[in-house]
Design a protein with these regions (language model features):
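ATP-dependent adenylation/nucleotidyltransferase module used to activate substrates
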Residues: 1-159
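Histidine/lysine/aspartate-rich catalytic loop segments that bind and position anionic ligands
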Residues: 149, 158-175
Length: 175
């Protein structure tokens, strides 16, 4: 069984899944897999924020439509958080905690127990305070669990004809 099959089986075992969906390479592949195995029990959840370019929000809408996954939005204005506008050294950690909290609340209110994101095995090579924050928050990282690298995600995405397979990485506007 290859990695994609193992991830699909793991997704299936979750019964219902919220995918934290940015419309990037990683979350698009994860949303596609979730939609294929869970059908209507998968939802892509996008945070709509002033720190996310409008173009990215529109692309996320289009990608979710292409995949056929239910797509929901949560509005968040990180710029209203005193802790974040002070720009502390751990702002990425704090921002991820804030985002995870609103996603967890949405999931709970809508009957979902499991939330997954597109963090991948290659992300562990960089300084990523969001990995620590989201792990603490109980967010599932299937691409890390199954040791799927960014290169593999691009390759799988290309094979599945996802238009994001060669999409460049997008840095956070707060960085």
């Amino acid at each position: 069984m290859d990695k994609l099959q193992r991830i699909s089986e793991a997704i299936k075992s979750k019964k219902k899944l919220v995918v934290m969906f940015s419309g990037g390479v990683d979350s698009t592949l994860l949303a596609k897999l979730a939609r294929e195995v869970l059908e209507k029990n998968a939802v892509a959840l996008t945070i709509d924020s002033p720190v996310i370019p409008r173009k990215e929000i529109e692309e996320a809408k289009n990608l979710a439509n292409l995949i056929g996954i239910r797509h929901e939005f949560i509005e968040l204005n990180e710029l209203k958080s005193r802790h974040l506008i002070e720009n502390p050294p751990d702002r990425c950690y704090l921002c991820r905690k804030l985002r995870d909290n609103i996603v967890k609340n949405w999931a709970r209110e809508n009957g979902f127990d499991v939330i997954a994101d597109g963090l991948n095995f290659s992300d562990l090579q960089d300084y990523r305070p969001g990995v620590k924050a989201s792990t603490e928050d109980g967010i599932w990282h299937p691409f890390i669990e199954f040791e799927v690298t960014k290169e593999e995600i691009r390759d799988f995405s290309r094979k599945l004809s996802l238009p994001t397979w060669n999409k460049p990485a997008m840095a956070c506007l707060c960085s």
